[in-house]
Amino acid sequence: MRIVRARFVAAIVLLTMSAAAHADDYSLDDVAIVTSLATYRARHVDVVGAALSRDDALKLLAVGGASSAAEGLAKIDAARISIPELVSETRAGDFAQTTVYHDVAIERVAHGVADSVAAAGLTIESRRGAETAKGRFGALHAEGVDFPAAARMTLEQRTSPDQPKQQIMATLSLLDIRIDVPDGGGLAVDRLTGRNFGGRPLAASMSGLVELAPRPGQPPDARTQQAVAAMISDLLASIDIGALEMDGLQIKTGAAADNSEAPGAMKARHVALAGVADGKVASFTMEGIDSAGPADAFHIDRIALSGFDARPAFAADVGAGARAAPHFDHAEIAGASIAADGAPVSIGAITVDARDWMDLTPTSLVARAEHIVTSLTGAGVRRSPQLAALGYDRLDLSAALDLNLDRDKHELSLNDLSLRDDAVGGVRLSGVFGHVSPDLFSGVEDRMRNALLSIVVWRAALRLENRGALDRYVDALAKANGMTPAVMRGKLAATARAMALALFTTRPDPRADVVAQAASAFVDGARTFDLSLAAPQGVGAIDLMMAGQLGVLMDKLKIDANAK
């Protein structure tokens, strides 16, 4: 859509040069202008109050070319320029696009900057091979349009890596956007508004993006993929947007030829971006999201992102074999519900704070999920038949993850990894791990596996919490075996003690007895069980995997346990 707007701006201002007259009114018929990006045609152009003479305008038009367009546009002064129909045609290889603008009006142009630009609507048809996509747009209105700056961005190449950006458009409003793609999918927006659009020329010509676009059914080769990624990364870094909002967004996905699923749709009541600069997005929100496609229908009240940066993913594509993901500082989902084949799931809130990113993952992460509620009745029984058998009709889960990597010390702190249901119980893990290589976060399988095997454990802790599930289990087991709950609990406590001893020792050891007593007490009615392990010299991941019993490592461990 940015390219469409840029072409629109460039087309309008180039045509004005052929119709301007010195402080007078002129008309011109059958205008055709050729640029490196497209060919523009207009059957009729009316110019009112032009300061530039007709002869001078024709001279500027004759010079043409990307190198002189911006300078020529800066000489345009006119009270009003009207174009009933403007046609833009772009061709590159087997790609062709035709855009038709209707009833274009440009008001109060001074030195190439217009107070306002409006069009009653426009249509787009793009063809590549046998594939055709079509778009229809309603009324367009823009203010503070800097035509010379737009020409520099769309027709020129960057002269230096740090070339400053210029504001191209102060405000934009576009109504009734409808785009249809060949597979039956499409996009619709009731209203799009934005402000403070800026940019600079790309390192390579913008027309190169069109030439490099993949062909239908022909995945790009590695070299083309890297070139496209480099240009997209440059484009993201070369465009600024103060704010952009969409109302009534609808994305329709069509069925592929080998997919029997019917088309589906995702709708959003409101979408907003703010602070888009240097490839980063300060904030992004999407509200009132609904999907009723062939998969499970869902609703989300709100999705929000801040500090979003997509450039690392494209930069990774430039390097052979590299992998990376977009980065963000904060993400949240609020008020979600999923139909899930008759077993609905709802989510109160999920928040994620991420810092100190490597290629694929952050090395500082705090995530929270509250009130993930799922039914255990009807079709929901399959989610946990064991809990359903104990009489639970739903789960209401909360979860947490808190970790941090100290790159200087190569030390990973797992501060919290937990899951809890206030009516069932909970589990929490924490620990400190050493010799943690950055390769663990690389996303490259071999490097991640080797890094995992190199880790040593300094400290680890486990907490189990009984909020009722263990009591229900004891009662159910007692009933099934014709015992009282007290007798059954005693048997289970003895079993827990024996299992703890078998896990922690190959010979009598008072430290193992402490663990066994705590495990027995937990089963016998205590609400919490805490186990902590400390290894002053560190225990390697390989040692843990090869040890048949923790008792083999007892001399390296400090163990404590209690139940309350």
Named regions from a protein language model:
Residues 24-564:
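Glycine-rich, small/hydroxylated-residue low-complexity segments
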